[in-house]
Curated annotation (Swiss-Prot):
SUPFAM superfamilies: Trypsin-like serine proteases (SSF50494). It is found in: Cell membrane. Its main location: membrane. Belongs to the MG067/MG068/MG395 family. It comes from Mycoplasma pneumoniae (strain ATCC 29342 / M129 / Subtype 1). Keywords: Cell membrane, Lipoprotein, Membrane, Palmitate, Signal. It is a lipid-anchor. This is Uncharacterized lipoprotein MPN_582. Disulfide bonds: none annotated. Residues 1-22 form the signal peptide.
């Protein structure tokens, strides 16, 4: 079955397999008249920083189903969007490996598709005997000539395409927002009203309670710069993202820290890779040669050809809000996840429910596959992470989870959920990204 990865038919089918995304739970399929599709933002637009920071993430899994001594093998994929949140330079003491590590923020419901036996504990403790990730791609809509001379593929020199690049190894899980505040819900609640109001301080850990999660996670992707494909990913994807990150103010200034009343005064910019039933020129950038062995990592399976160009009937397109003068979407409302979007999930035998605050953004809804997109405000600060869309007959909104917020002391704004900080932490937050980054 591994040989199938080397066939052109498998490559061309990678972007057309079953696609799962929480965004699709709210979104009418493939409605994109109000958006720019495969339109790279100009350098003066706020969306250009968003474009540089943002990538397609594709997890392609092998699924083995066993029934009465019969095995059936299927392939499925989960696509999402991620963005640069951090990086680790090459260790000067280990120049032979020449490893540069990239950290990409996305939704928790996207990263849960990763099934890597070499993942960090406890994320390698899933039952992955029958489901495993066999191919991972990081992608972007860009100029083909950045990766290969278009003439070698019979293409015009100005050709732009969706580029899906295969790194040397599978990524790992750096951080997920499970149990990020010290609150739980009673397991034996009888109705929704109780569920909204009974988050209580957890005195002792109890797996039978309902635990909080935020739809936020961080992926760790090693790039080995002696490898030609990894070097191209670094040069043409990651370096522009690092420059954009620094131009926005670097880590101390790039993340907004607002009060809940401040959101209504801003415009918001959402850019991602929604999955659309529209023809898509695609360039696959592949690992080639012999299968590699990398200690502590899961090496990806090489292909016969370093570059494969194709036209897919549908796939992940670069999408962004089409608004007057590129001024983004406006604030629609603040919401409490427990009240408005009580999503549930299981992890290591425990039940979790979505927790925290978020905002609705007018004209900010993108199709499935845009899950994990960053949300920039008009001050060029990151305020939230996009996780779903909501559609009515007359209106549509993008939904985003706040990454950090602070309460106003004179108001009872923490009645439903306490103020938290998933990036740097605060007195309420017991699990946040900076803890991992310091290790």
């Amino acid at each position: 079955m591994w040989v199938a990865l080397k066939r052109f038919g498998f490559l061309s089918g990678l972007l057309a397999l079953t696609v799962l995304s929480a965004c699709s739970a709210f979104r009418k399929p493939d409605k994109f008249e109000g958006y720019y599709i495969n339109n790279i933002p100009g350098s003066a637009e706020i969306d250009h920083a968003n474009y540089d920071l943002t990538f397609f993430l594709g997890f392609f899994n092998r699924i083995e189903k066993t029934e009465k001594d019969k095995s059936q093998i299927d392939f499925g994929s989960i696509h999402g969007t991620g963005w640069l949140i951090d990086w680790k330079e090459v260790d000067k003491k280990d120049k032979k490996a020449n490893k540069f590590t990239v950290y990409l923020a996305t939704n928790l419901h996207v990263i849960q598709a990763l099934k890597n036996r070499e993942d960090h504990p406890p994320y390698n403790q899933f039952d992955i005997n029958f489901v495993r990730t066999v191919d991972f791609r990081i992608g972007k809509y860009t100029d083909v000539k950045q990766f290969v001379a278009p003439s070698k593929l019979g293409l015009p020199n100005s050709t732009q395409a969706f580029v899906a690049a295969q790194p040397t190894v599978l990524p790992k899980t750096a951080f997920i927002a499970h149990d990020f505040v010290n609150y739980t819900l009673s397991k034996d609640q009888k109705n929704k009203k109780q569920r909204e109001q009974q988050w209580k301080v957890q005195i002792k850990p109890n797996k039978d309670e309902v635990h909080p999660y935020a739809d936020s996670a961080v992926l760790e992707l090693p790039l080995f710069l002696n490898n030609s494909s990894d070097r191209q990913i670094f040069d043409h994807f990651i370096q522009p993202a690092i420059r954009a990150y620094k131009q926005l103010g670097d880590s101390l200034n790039i993340f907004a820290y607002p009060t809940l009343d401040q959101f209504k005064h801003s415009h918001y910019y959402v850019l991602g890779y929604p999955y659309i039933a529209k023809k898509l020129p695609t360039l696959f950038v592949n690992q080639t040669g012999k299968e590699k062995t990398v200690p502590g990592e899961t090496a990806q399976i090489p292909n016969d050809q370093p570059f494969v160009s194709t036209i897919n009937e549908e796939g992940p397109h670069l999408g962004r809000i089409k608004s007057d003068k590129f001024n983004g979407g406006t604030w629609a409302w603040n919401h409490d996840n427990t009240k408005n979007f009580p999503f549930n999930r299981q992890f290591r035998g425990k039940e979790y429910q979505m927790y925290g605050k978020g905002i609705g953004i007018t004209n900010g809804s993108l199709s499935r596959g845009a899950s994990g997109s960053l949300v920039l405000n008009n001050k060029r600060q990151i305020v939230a992470i996009y996780f779903a869309s909501r559609i009515t007959e007359t209106q549509e909104w993008g939904l985003a989870q706040l990454l950090r917020w602070k309460p106003r002391s004179v108001l009872n704004e923490e009645k439903d959920s306490v103020a938290y900080d998933l990036i740097f932490g605060n007195s309420n937050t017991k699990k946040y990204y900076a803890q991992f980054a310091k290790k």
